[in-house]
Structures are given as structure tokens and as C-alpha cells.
Swiss-Prot record:
Residues of the active site: S96, H121
Subunit structure: Fourteen ClpP subunits assemble into 2 heptameric rings which stack back to back to give a disk-like structure with a central cavity, resembling the structure of eukaryotic proteasomes.
Gene: clpP1
Name of this protein: ATP-dependent Clp protease proteolytic subunit 1
Keyword terms of this UniProt record: Cytoplasm, Hydrolase, Protease, Serine protease
GO biological process: protein quality control for misfolded or incompletely synthesized proteins
Stated role: Cleaves peptides in various proteins in a process that requires ATP hydrolysis. Has a chymotrypsin-like activity. Plays a major role in the degradation of misfolded proteins.
CDD domains: S14_ClpP_2
Catalytic activity field: Hydrolysis of proteins to small peptides in the presence of ATP and magnesium. alpha-casein is the usual test substrate. In the absence of ATP, only oligopeptides shorter than five residues are hydrolyzed (such as succinyl-Leu-Tyr-|-NHMec, and Leu-Tyr-Leu-|-Tyr-Trp, in which cleavage of the -Tyr-|-Leu- and -Tyr-|-Trp bonds also occurs)
GO cellular component: cytoplasm; endopeptidase Clp complex
Entries under HAMAP family matching the protein: ClpP
């Protein structure tokens, strides 16, 4: 069930679902596992907000256990392709692809609430079938591992070797630890706004 917000204006009452109301404030919410369906919605919202105002920041709130690498890379590429800065804010959990997207926000505008958890690791996968099919899948997951690690190294300022070692297994961090690591820039208690810039 999605809550509805009622707004009253000179033209009467108008009902919005909560996500549409947040979109008016340039807030996009990724609050579940990253899958093709919700990744497409995030991409569409980012493109819409760029068309509305290409200069004004967009706020991407993330509370996600991770998910599909290809779907997440679609969001990542869109974040980098559009003109507005995308400020990322972790609320609750940003794990796996969620942490990757958190770190991909505009430099200086990657944030977390103080009690959030952030986790990085290597991509997960599995294969079955003939030996040749398994070999193809193994090559693909190794390619994705190298790609994600290189981007994480770029986002954090860490060496590729350090990122590769740290993502070998689940690596959980507090908000402060993820700031020290370079995944985020700030631990915040209040939401940034136009009157209270980052």
C-alpha cells in the first residue's frame, strides 16, 4: 500500500502518491532490491528531473540490499550521463549494488544517515549447463568484478588492489567507517535543502 498525500491549493484538493510528491522535491527513492523494473523507474525519474531543470541537484535515497549488476549499471550510467548532480543518501542499508550506487553520487554530495550500514563485496553469480556455458558465465562474472572494482577504486580513491582484497568477502561498514573509506563524503543528521546547501 502506497500512502497518499492531499494538497490543498486555490484550485482545490489534489491527491498524490507519496513517491510522486517526493519527485516534485527532486527526491528519487530506491528502497528495494535493484531489479530491471525498479531500475527502469529510477532511470526514468532521473531523466524526467533533468528535463525539468538540468542545473538543480537530484537526491537519490538508497535503502537497498543490492541486486542485479546490469540493472544497477543502467542507473549508474544514467547518473553520470545526466547534467544535474545526483546526491546520494543512504538510509538503513546500502549493500552490494546499493553501496556501489551510493558511492557513485556527485563528489562531495555522497551521504549517509548515522545509523546506516554499508556493505561492499564481489558480484554474486551462478551457472549451470554444459562446461562451455559455465566457462562463458565465469568469464562474464570476472569481467563484472573487475569493472565494479575499478569504479569503486575511482569513487573511493583506494587502490584497485585494496578494493579487490576488501570485496573478496562481505565488508560491512558503519556510516563513519564508510566516510573514512571514501564511499561517502558526509554523515548527516538533516536532509540538505536549497536553503541549507551541502
Amino acid at each position: 500500500m502506497i500512502p497518499t498525500v492531499i494538497e490543498t491549493s486555490g484550485r482545490g484538493d489534489r491527491a498524490f502518491d507519496i513517491y510522486s510528491r517526493l519527485l516534485r522535491e527532486r527526491i528519487v527513492f530506491l528502497g528495494q532490491e535493484v531489479r530491471d523494473e525498479n531500475a527502469n523507474l529510477v532511470v526514468a525519474q532521473l531523466l524526467f528531473l533533468e528535463a525539468e531543470d538540468p542545473e538543480k541537484d537530484i537526491y537519490l535515497y538508497i535503502n537497498s540490499p543490492g541486486g542485479s549488476v546490469s540493472a544497477g549499471l543502467g542507473i549508474f550510467d544514467t547518473m553520470n550521463q545526466i547534467r544535474p548532480d545526483v546526491c546520494t543518501i543512504c538510509i538503513g542499508l546500502a549493500a552490494s549494488m546499493g553501496a556501489f550506487l551510493l558511492s557513485a553520487g556527485a563528489k562531495g554530495k555522497r551521504m549517509s544517515l548515522p545509523n546506516s550500514r554499508i556493505m561492499i563485496h564481489q558480484p554474486l553469480g551462478g551457472a549451470q549447463g554444459q562446461a562451455t556455458d559455465i566457462e562463458i558465465q565465469a568469464k562474464e562474472i570476472l569481467y563484472l568484478k573487475a569493472l565494479l572494482n575499478q569504479h569503486l577504486a575511482n569513487h573511493t580513491g583506494k587502490s584497485l588492489e585494496e578494493i579487490t582484497a576488501d570485496t573478496e568477502r562481505d565488508f560491512f561498514m558503519s556510516a563513519e567507517e564508510s566516510k573514512e573509506y571514501g564511499l561517502i563524503d558526509q554523515v548527516i543528521n538533516r536532509r540538505p535543502s536549497a536553503s541549507d546547501p551541502i
